[in-house]
Amino acid sequence: MSAIGHSPTACSRCSRPRLRRKDLTSVLSPRLPCFKVSSSGEAFATDKADFITPKDLDDPCASPGWEASSLAQAKRYGKSKMANVLFAAELQRRMDAEGVDIISISLNPGPVKTQGAADVLPFMVRPMVWLFFKDPAEGAQTTLFAAAAAEIREEKERWKGGYLDGPGKLKSPSPRARDPQVAYNLWHTTESAVRAIGVLDKS
C-alpha cells in the first residue's frame, strides 16, 4: 500500500495517466496535435474488473495470504495494463466531445526483455524472458510508431482510440478492455481517488 492509501500498481499505472491529462491539454496547439500513448499489455488481466469503487483499484487479485504470489502479481499487472487501454479509449471519447485535437492510442509492445516482465512471471519460467523475449530496442518499435508515424497524423480517424498490437497493426482488445461503461467507471473512480488526495482541483 502506498502512502496515499492505494496499491503501488494502481498508483503508478492507473492514476498517473489520469494526472497527466491536464498537462496534455495545456500544451495543445491547433498546429501541433498532441498524442497520448499508453503502453499497455493485458494478457494477465482478470475479467472481473469493473472499477466502480476505489477498492476496485486496490483489488489484490488473490485470496488472503496469497497476495505476494506470482499469479496475483501477474493479475494485478494485467489489470493495471487493461486500465491503460480503457483510459486511452475514454480519453479519446472525451477529447472528441470537447473538440480537442488529440489522438489517444493504447498499445501492446509484446514480450520485452525487462526486469519488470520477469518479475511478474513465476520464478521457474523467468529465464524464458532473457532467452526468448524481444530486446528493448525492438520492443519499442510499436511505441515509436504510435508517437511518430506520419500516417497516424494523416489518417487520424482510423487511429483514434485504437489499440496497436505491433507497428501499424490495429487490433481489438479483450471485450472488457473495450467496454465503454467500464472505461467510464474507471475514469470517474480514478478521478475521485486523485481528487481525494488534493492532486486535482475541486472545480
Swiss-Prot record:
Keyword Transcription regulation: no
SUPFAM superfamilies: NAD(P)-binding Rossmann-fold domains
Domain of life: Eukaryota
Recorded GO MF terms: oxidoreductase activity
Active site positions: 77 (proton acceptor), 81 (lowers pka of active site tyr)
EC number: 1.1.1.-
Applications: Diterpenoid pyrones display various biological activities and FDDP C shows anti-cancer and anti-HIV activities. FDDP C also shows inhibitory activity of 42-mer-amyloid beta aggregation that is involved in the pathogenesis of Alzheimer's disease.
Any one Gene Ontology BP term: terpenoid biosynthetic process
PANTHER family: PHOSPHATIDYLINOSITOL-GLYCAN BIOSYNTHESIS CLASS F PROTEIN (PTHR43157:SF31), PHOSPHATIDYLINOSITOL-GLYCAN BIOSYNTHESIS CLASS F PROTEIN-RELATED (PTHR43157)
Function comment: Short chain dehydrogenase/reductase; part of the gene cluster that mediates the biosynthesis of diterpenoid pyrones. The first step of the pathway is the synthesis of the alpha-pyrone moiety by the polyketide synthase dpmpA via condensation of one acetyl-CoA starter unit with 3 malonyl-CoA units and 2 methylations. The alpha-pyrone is then combined with geranylgeranyl pyrophosphate (GGPP) formed by the GGPP synthase dpmpD through the action of the prenyltransferase dpmpC to yield a linear alpha-pyrone diterpenoid.
Descriptive protein name: Short chain dehydrogenase/reductase dpmpH
Organism of provenance: Macrophomina phaseolina (strain MS6)
